[in-house]
Amino acid sequence: NATADVEATSRCFLELLRKGQLHPAVLEGKSEQLRMLQEAQTITIKGIGLKHVNLKKASQKLVQKQESESTKPISTSLSAKLDAAPFVHLHNHSQFSVLQATSKMSQMVSVAAENQMPAIAITDHANLMGAFHFIKAVGNHNKDAVEEAQIKPIVGCEFYVCEDHKDKTRRDDGYQVVFLAKNKKGYHNLAKMSSIAYVDGFYYVPRIDRQVVAMYKDDLIVLTGNLYGEVPSKILNLGNRQAEEALQWWHGMFGADFYVELMRHGQEDEKRANEVLISLAKQYEIPLIATNNTYYATKEEANAHDILLCLKEGEKQATPIGRGRGFRYGFPNQEYYIKSSEEMKILFKDLPEAVLNIEALIDKIEPFKLAREVLLPKFGIPEAYLVPNDPDGKLGENNFLRYLTYEGAKKRYATLTDEITERIDFELSVIAKTGYPGYFLIVQDLIAAAREMDVSVGPGRGSAAGSVVAYCLKITNIDPIEYNLLFERFLNPDRVSMPDIDIDFDDEGRAKVMDYVIDKYGSNQVAQIITYGTMAAKSSIRDTARVLDLALNEADRISKLLPNIKLSKIFGLPEKDLKKALRTDEFIKVKEFMALAEESSLSGETIQQAIVLEGSLRNTGTHACGVIITPDDITKFVPVATAKDSD
């Protein structure tokens, strides 16, 4: 309340002046004015009689009044429709919104199943890192569920849409807009946009722009998003005309696949934005969709989620939420969880169409799988070994592999005995049957190139040492016949699976090999594998303790009570099973740890919140040596991002 602030500040200043309590430099040369003030004002400076209004409370009363006026009883038939209609959460963030959400895939699926929801969506911030895990989690549920309880997985993404994603001269985080894939093609368009956001558009956050949206808009559904979406944000910050222009662009771009998203988390700004959004939706005949912007699975996890946000910002939880110096980022309330169908229907009982429209939206979604057969890059073979009418090139690859193997065998063995040729032919037949001749050609080429560059290559590790073909190709340097090593442990004709050859390069040479792979196959077909750093038991204790401002020595004492076991097991296993899994001294410490968790002290609170946060994603990185090579542009298959230390 600016009026109250000005009056209070003025009174304080005049009172200090009257008492001569200001700094001498301020009072210098003003003795006469000070004397006159003190003579005229002999008592404490009083207020001037302003009637101060608590604007926050007044605003809340106004909102409540408006809500009560707008809430009209709906007809019996419409009420029955609403009761029978399915509700589906279409705006959800998982742990893969790193340090922003705590929801695990299993939790999301469980909540959907408990509420008989026919579908559920994942819409992490700008990335699709969790898409495979999400579809797998839903698939695991569906395997054991009856047909009526099947859940449809909806893969989506909440993108930051800015003015120009390549402009890095000024910060522009853009607007947060939700995209949902209608089918597999839509998923690939999401993957393309996510790759562009990270590779070309990363500046503070991964960004795309309208040009990118227009290029990859096919088979996608768009929701207007939260208060940071383009249309709601312009309603609140620029004006209704600008918001309407934005809505016209999105509606023109996506037509019947564009929906106006309404949220009710109990915020005043939502009420203001929703009134205009509803009006615009009616004007342009755009369907309304009710959502809850979820970041944690249950309301009880709200505090743990707030601790996670503090970790991200490097703040203490005791710091008040707000903007500016002395404040920290945090959510305004505890309503950002995966609410039940009943809760959502009550929230939108005055706007039943916002719930009823969901069914038509999810009917547009075609489920798809991301698990697929292994894709290998095309390995160029000499024309002499090619076979006509060989569309996938496997026959030619088998021919060339046989040639290289026998050429190598002549150098490896003084005499090619029947035993050796039988073993080679057997292995080549299994390789041909499994369909992976190209894999051996790629690996032998890679190792040959490494040796030419004087890179140290290991002699062979793991089950690949049991392959005579690998030995003849100089992939390994251990003769499996001499040491009676079994090929079947490496590649079994009765259980077809991808061969796995572990290759060791020296640390300095690894970069040379990587450069060779990029030069041979192209930078757009080669990528390193992303890794995820999660909060383990002890690190979740220490991180939580730091945010809650628990004494460092107490945090160390608690973490030292933990053996190498997950918190979820400590509090999830029956005591007899836990006792079997631990040594006697470890079990005694764990019992002390569990007793501490029951306390209402700060130590107990730390443990309870750490249990929720355990397993949360802490950071991303790159695998030390894992590399993916694809047969075409890698972004046609999976989304990519740029590593922090990459150029």
Q: Across the structure, where does each feature detected by a protein language model lie?
A:
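Acidic, low-complexity intrinsically disordered tails
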Residues: L27-F87, N142-E148
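Alpha-helical scaffold/interaction cores of sigma-54-like transcription cofactors
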Residues: Q66-D647
